[in-house]
Amino acid sequence: MGGGTPIITPMHQCLAANVISEVEGIVNGTTNFMLTKMVRENLGFDEALKIAQELGYAETKDPGDDVDGRDACRKIAILSSLVCGHQIYPQNIPTRGIRDITVADVAAAERLNCVIKLIAWCKSLSIHCVMSLLSR
């Protein structure tokens, strides 16, 4: 999950002695790769997607699970279910992927000394998977 980051077992181990009140992070390596390429190489979405597909990071036939945020949504649903102690369903999580990000969006973020990332988060039963503007 999240680029192979082991998180589920440590969460299980921590839950026995601690209360986790918030989970937040970049849980989809493909979109993170693409957004980084867009910033560093001034690429458009389609160009970044093509590179991700050529490298085998994104599906060639239907990259929608990654770029539309469905993969990240499913991952935060799993993590949120662990934290909350009951099933959280992906269809109940507001989700927006990166498909509509443009070179102009990336440039606007840069002017603010920020970057755009797909962040999945759960805090006090408020769960989202959306693009976020993060300061550098």
Region annotations inferred by a language model:
Residues 37, 47-136:
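Substrate-binding/catalytic subdomain of NAD(P)-dependent oxidoreductase enzymes
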Residues 1-57, 63-71:
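Rossmann-like NAD(P)H-binding beta-loop-alpha module
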